[in-house]
Swiss-Prot record:
Modified residues (N6-acetyllysine): 16
Expressing tissues: Red blood cells.
Modified residues (Phosphoserine): 3, 35, 49, 102, 124, 138
Function: Involved in oxygen transport from the lung to the various peripheral tissues.
Residues making up the signal peptide according to the UniProt record: none
Protein name: Hemoglobin subunit alpha
Domain of life: Eukaryota
Subunit organization: Heterotetramer of two alpha chains and two beta chains.
Modified residues (Phosphothreonine): 108, 134
GO-annotated molecular function: haptoglobin binding; heme binding; iron ion binding; organic acid binding; oxygen binding; oxygen carrier activity; peroxidase activity
A single cellular component GO annotation: haptoglobin-hemoglobin complex
Amino acid sequence: VLSPADKSNVKAAWDKVGGSAGDYGAEALERMFLSFPTTKTYFPHFDLSHGSAQVKGHGKKVGDALGNAVAHLDDLPGALSALSDLHAHKLRVDPVNFKLLSHCLLVTVACHHPNDFTPAVHASLDKFLANVSTVLVSKYR
């Protein structure tokens, strides 16, 4: 459960991401594909090269979904229900991949905002992304 301080940290960090959420999402995806090559198996139809339109497009979806989650911190299950259904029933993404992408998102935010990425912000974003991952895998059972 996110504390009031966590919620404040997440909102403040996401405000810094601002209109670049799609770019951060794409960068995190690229980082994930390079660091964890097995994740590429879910995107056999994508051009996974640096800067590809398909990775940018999916990065925008990731960024938009996270922005929606930040806007609904008190109701993540409601905000992410359709996405949970999609990943569990249609895409059948292995749940471990959400943890890998979360790690890559943390690294991406830290790289772009090193002075703002304090231990407290890091912990809050990590909790938030863990909560998002938990919601996304909730329909797997």
